Amino acid sequence: MRIEIDAAKPSGPLKPIWRFFGADEPNYAYMKHGDELLGHLGDLKKDQVFFRAHSLLVTGEGTHALKWGSTNAYTEDAQVNPVYDWTIVDRIFDTYRKNGVRPYVQIGFMPQALSVKPEPYRHHWTPKAKYDEIYTGWAYPP
């Protein structure tokens, strides 16, 4: 296949491709600067901008860190029954919507209770971290 483009000749309007944004840290959305950033994105074109975050099923207290986030959406009680808690996920999506941004949902990563390698679960990312230091319990399938 050969594609030729004459840059001196208009070919038509350019459809916006800037409508989709994303990040690793879901909890950053409701932090001061995350909320502010979502506001700027929503101002681009209200209700036409989408945002996707990783880690929506990761077990944890809901605080953000570099390359990490958590929602505690799925845990298990002492009898190994599922416990679903969408409080943090709702807070994330409510922050998107408050700012005129639509969630582009990626149901991702492994709750600790379902991981075949639950410990260590959380990683502490650094630019020099090797993959075997990062791929901890959150990344293991059941």
Name what the model sees in each region.
Residues M1-P142:
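Non-catalytic accessory regions flanking glycosidase/transglycosidase catalytic cores in CAZymes
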